[in-house]
Design a protein with these regions (language model features):
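STAS-typified acidic loop motif
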Residues: 2-30
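Short acidic-hydrophobic, aromatic-tinged amphipathic segments that line or gate anion-handling sites
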Residues: 98-103
């Protein structure tokens, strides 16, 4: 798992690559939370275009960042999920949540 972050105005864009599993989520989670806290971030955009696999720990990481952004009055978007990741998002119910609240 590899990731990159970039701030564009008040948005933090996080590009994830590879597999999201229990071995990598704590590092990603902690770094994203740190960047949200120290920068003036009001939107979090998570680019899933290069994610090949995601397990339940990835779902937990996404939901935790969503709750963090909502508690700050911000918003979060998931963009470009690959078909297999999109299916995980759909089965977990997260896809519906993001379509409804983050369009």
């Amino acid at each position: 798992m590899r990731y990159e972050t970039e701030q564009i105005g008040g948005a933090l864009v996080v590009k994830l690559y590879g597999e999201i599993d229990q071995h990598c989520v704590s590092e990603i989670r902690d770094d994203i939370d740190r960047q949200i806290a120290i920068r003036n971030i009001n939107s979090l955009i998570v680019d899933l275009g290069a994610v090949e696999f995601m397990e339940s720990s990835g779902i937990g990481m996404i939901m935790g960042r969503y709750k963090n952004m909502v508690s700050r009055g911000g918003k979060m978007m998931l963009v470009r999920p690959q078909p297999q990741v999109d299916k995980v998002l759909e089965l977990s119910g997260i896809k519906k949540l993001f379509e409804k609240n983050c369009g």
